[in-house]
Amino acid sequence: MNDKDTFRMHTKVIQIGDRKIGGGNPIAIQSMTNTKTEDVKATVEQILRLERAGCEIIRCTVPTLEAAAAIREIKKQIHIPLVADIHFDYRMALAAIENGADKIRINPGNIGNPERVKAVVDAAKERNIPIRVGVNSGSLEKPLVEKYGGVTAEGIVESALDKVHMIEDLGYDNLVISIKSSDVLMCVKAHELLAGRTVYPLHVGITESGTVNSGNIKSAIGLSLILSQGIGDTIRVSLTGDPVEEIKSAKLILRTLGLRKGGIEVVSCPTCGRTQINLIDLATKVEKMVEDYPLDIKVAVMGCVVNGPAEAKEADLGVAGGIGEGLLIKHGEIVKKLPEDQLLPALKEELDHWS
């Protein structure tokens, strides 16, 4: 599958800093810092690491006026749009906007009375920065829980649209919507319902998905079910761990679905009793080695000479192990036989001179 084959629902184009989302623009990968935003040095260092990994939009929490003030200095040192995450106190939103946030994320239902919501909307309107309207299943309003007999996809969607209409009634439509749940199937259903009822870009993610292991599985399932229907304009893989891992996972999900090109795909056999080299170690090292290559190719790491050579030939580049040695295979042809300890350097040399 390639980009031309991949169906995308049409949504409104929204500008976030220098990045456009919606309207068929590439799906943007987001993450969120886990530093104290007031700590400018630590926050900038983490954002720069995320940039190098492929993060395209970053969100920072703004719980204090000091955090809001830090946005101005942080933005001087980073290269991607910054979203201010606001909860409860509308003054944090006003301060974040004043200090140059490229977008703000709010739940209009938890930042106070209508006058406070209007103050935030007016400030965003003055600078023409988007507002992301965020609703999570865990904070669904009691009347909607009672109306639908519990927390449901229908309730989540109604809550989100109520908030959107609140802002539209104030004369502003520079909006992005996010609806999240840790329940994968509920989250999928909610996105299906919402996508048919709005033209605003959707930020997609499975919230509180868990650690790197469990969170990756839940996010891959949920995001794939949503994205494969053409729904979604930005994504985040929410993990309990280093945010850089979120970017790696998001890139792999998009590439697997044919929604993004670039980056080397590593395939390897699951090992069996025929494996004749230390394949687990080799495959792990290959996967780490290729992270920063922009090449759009497939590399195979196979463990034995029974099926290895034939399977490696389906890749652009590969190795197939023997007893303490292995074959280097390129474009389906065996290039050379090498000792096991030379396979990784040989792969790297081929990648460095790839054409």
Located regions from the model:
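Alpha-helix-loop-beta-strand connector modules within alpha/beta enzyme cores
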Residues: 65-86, 119-131, 191-202, 286-288
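Glycine-enriched alpha-helix->loop->beta-strand junction motifs that scaffold or abut catalytic
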Residues: 78-80, 98-104, 125-128, 195-201, ...
